[in-house]
Amino acid sequence: MPTLKDIRVRIKGVKSTQQVTKAMKMVAAAKLRKAQERAVMARPYAAKLKEMLGSLSGKVDTSASPLLADRADASRVLVVLITSDRGLCGAFNTNIIKLAHRTIHEEYAAAYAAGNVQLICAGTRGFDFFRKRGYSVLKGYPAVFQNLDFSTAREIAETASSMYVKGEVDRVVVVYNEFKSVLAPTLKAEVLLPIKSELPVAEGGDYIYEPSPAAIIEELVPKHLNTQVWGMMLESNAAEQAARMTAMDSATENAKELLRGLNISYNRARQAAITKELSEIVGGADALQN
């Protein structure tokens, strides 16, 4: 049975942990507001680019941009995995790594068996996981979310598009967390390349393109890819902060329950010690009288 001193030490330790988790929850909440704002602000621009590309895709031949050309046989695959740099965010990284693993070993099992699956990992957790297990990690961006910048998204998009144009890969898939709400992030494995031909055609009046749809699409496609990757990174960052805030809130509540139980145990042990001392005093007094 633990002594009063042991229980006091545990209470002190739990209180210290509770203060840390509470502070981390507040920090995550502040970061979430900022990350959510950035993700929401990026959506309209990405949607408009997608709309324009949808309007153009029906007016040009796929030869206008090799990134529009579909390849039926996905025998060489590039997986872009977006995880977090740090832990203490619940099952955020575990779930997204599981999805990436399942995508590689189920959807692209033949390509993996032939050694034709490569990865680009944005975020320390995913990078460390797949590198240590012997996967072909083409590029890693550890600690990328410490200072999230558009240049990283552009570099990833340019690397992926260059490999696709050169025929080094037949499919580019991005695995990430899409931010829907604090309690409902969505795991996604989205095909980035080839660009899907079923992009939504712009509603309403048609656009007039100068100098030509083919010339514009050549400029528009790289911007679209850059924006898509950037948006995915922003979504993942917001989902990470939401997961961390939720995890730290749960940890704080668990610490509160643990403290309640420890205080009850402490009071019972203290009461038992006092009762024992009183019994010894009474027993000693009786012995003296006799």
Curated annotation (Swiss-Prot):
One of its GO terms (molecular function) is proton-transporting ATP synthase activity, rotational mechanism. InterPro entries: ATP_synth_F1_ATPase_gsu, ATP_synth_F1_gsu, ATP_synth_F1_gsu_CS. Pfam families: ATP-synt (PF00231). The keyword Cell inner membrane applies. One of its GO terms (biological process) is proton motive force-driven plasma membrane ATP synthesis. CDD domains: F1-ATPase_gamma. The keyword Cell inner membrane applies. One of its GO terms (cellular component) is proton-transporting ATP synthase complex. It is a peripheral membrane protein. Keywords: ATP synthesis, Cell inner membrane, Cell membrane, CF(1), Hydrogen ion transport, Ion transport, Membrane, Transport. It is found in: Cell inner membrane. It comes from the Bacteria. Produces ATP from ADP in the presence of a proton gradient across the membrane. The gamma chain is believed to be important in regulating ATPase activity and the flow of protons through the CF(0) complex. F-type ATPases have 2 components, CF(1) - the catalytic core - and CF(0) - the membrane proton channel. CF(1) has five subunits: alpha(3), beta(3), gamma(1), delta(1), epsilon(1). CF(0) has three main subunits: a, b and c. NCBIfam families: ATPsyn_F1gamma, PRK13425.1. PANTHER family: ATP SYNTHASE GAMMA CHAIN, ATP SYNTHASE SUBUNIT GAMMA, MITOCHONDRIAL. Belongs to the ATPase gamma chain family. This is ATP synthase gamma chain. It comes from Chlorobium luteolum (strain DSM 273 / BCRC 81028 / 2530) (Pelodictyon luteolum). The gene is atpG.
